[in-house]
Amino acid sequence: MFLGDFLLLNLNNANSLNDNWMKRNMLMAALFLAATVGFAAKTESKAPWWMDPSVNRVNTLTPRASFFAYESAELAQKNQKESSSRFMTLEGDWNFNWVKDHDKAPAGFYAVDYDDSKWVKFPVPGLFEIHGYGDRIYKNVGYAWATQFSSNPPYIEEKNNYTGSYRKEFEIPADWKGDNIYMHVGSATSNLMLWVNGKFVGYSEDSKAEVEFDLTKFLQPGKKNLIAMQVMRWCDGSYLEDQDFWRFTGIAREVYLYATPKARVSDVYITPDLVNNYRDGKLDVKVSAENANGQKVSFELKDQTGKTVATAEGKVAGGKLAQTIELSNPQKWTAETP
């Protein structure tokens, strides 16, 4: 390994720059790509998705490396997405309804004209049990429902299956019109159902893994919009969580919207290596891009002081680009100088 604080990628197109910043630890995102993902349609399943092992994601984006697409190299180097005009947080108070049993959840709550005036305010991120909704359970071995019903995978009871329904109105910046707009949810346990402006968007049940949805066709920039979510305490995936931890329900990590140009870098995979008897270094970079065939992608590697130490350029073909960046005698990683 060798040292290098950040790599800047610039997708050159006539309309806008798409500068993507990522640290080398983004390679850990490959763990997400190894997950088995089901894409069965709801109409093809007799059981609801939350009891169907063949379905754990519906209409979600493919898991990717963790990075944010800034509008300038200067913002990318600061790495504070909150300062980007392409970022909009959804954190804070949402209108919230909690029921102990899933079958008591409000029907049609995602409709734009649904009356939620009697709902309470609840923080996002926030966990049900921490805020007084349901019992806090710590379990070392065995399932949290062991005293309530017998295990029969993949089936889960609706009784004591806490369910939280969320609603939030907000306005999208008018200058996001024409861009792609995505929603990022850092963690939803045990599952997440999503609607926008009364229309179903998607489903996910990978509790601790982040998930993203494409909201472009559902949102109206410059106008008031409604997002509705529903989270359940247990689903069929909960059978895989017989571990030593607190059994909490809700959204535990950041939630936000972000915008990108139509032509964009959608994923990056970087493999660092040492060559020439461990003296020199190289980065093998694989880029996935959308609506960018024939366009150039420029790479710029900077050290921890902000000095450019290497550059490269390649052209997208078939939505892909592979590029090698070579470095002469870079700083090496050690336990003393990580």
Predicted regions and their residues:
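Accessory beta-strand-rich segments of carbohydrate-active enzymes
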Residues: 43-57, 80-81, 95-99, 105, ...
